[in-house]
Amino acid sequence: MDKKRNISMAVIKRLPKYHRYLEELLRNEVDRISSKELSKKIGFTASQIRQDFNCFGDFGQQGYGYNVKELHAQISNILGLTKEYRCIILGGGNIGQAIANYNKFEKLGFRLEAIFDINPKLVGLKIRDIEIKDIDTLEDYLKENNVDVGIICVPSRSAQKVCDILTRNNVKGIWNFAPVDLKVPEGVFTENVHLSENLLTLSYLMNEQEE
């Protein structure tokens, strides 16, 4: 665990995929796996897999491979999944409701505690027993409750304003679904999910193949 310093973002981005495949192996009651076997499943080279894991410690044994249960636990710990994160959703429309209804996040330790929206037709509705609150009450809520992650699902014109409210109230993680790049202070971490950009990438790949 001492090797977590100066890990490249490319390696960090691959960790969730390792975690997902290791969960699948656990469900299938696989006890151990070699880097070569994992390579066939995950699509990275065996050398890349070994290099990635070596960034964090010596997980495998030569001639044995990796103990799946132990490796899964190690990756979970590296990803911070042994902790619990308090989350709120900003925007109770289609995307916000879809995220709220996806219970996989809670299994990973991300607990949804509140949903906010500006639309009076949505305020008061319940999603999985969580009542949508008026977004005008957001700042007061943040002063009274510790929140780790803000999930932004509002239109682009409102996203930065909402983000500013979150960051000045000590929210350190922003998961942004609004189609805009947010400005955040140092020490705040953002992950953007720009759905249209992914679709345009897919469009390019299909168009390139046709040519």
Swiss-Prot record:
Residues 17-56 bind DNA. InterPro entries: CoA-bd, NAD(P)-bd_dom_sf, Rex_DNA-bd_C_dom, Tscrpt_rep_Rex, WH-like_DNA-bd_sf, WH_DNA-bd_sf. NAD(+) binds at G91, G92, G93, N94, I95, G96. Gene3D superfamilies: NAD(P)-binding Rossmann-like Domain (3.40.50.720), Winged helix-like DNA-binding domain superfamily/Winged helix DNA-binding domain (1.10.10.10). It comes from the Bacteria. Keywords: Cytoplasm, DNA-binding, NAD, Repressor, Transcription, Transcription regulation. GO terms for molecular function: DNA binding; DNA-binding transcription factor activity. One of its GO terms (biological process) is negative regulation of DNA-templated transcription. It is found in: Cytoplasm. Its main location: cytoplasm. Pfam families: CoA_binding (PF02629), Put_DNA-bind_N (PF06971). GO terms for cellular component: cytoplasm. Homodimer. Belongs to the transcriptional regulatory Rex family. Modulates transcription in response to changes in cellular NADH/NAD(+) redox state. This is Redox-sensing transcriptional repressor Rex. The lineage of its organism: Bacteria, Bacillati, Bacillota, Clostridia, Eubacteriales. The gene is rex.
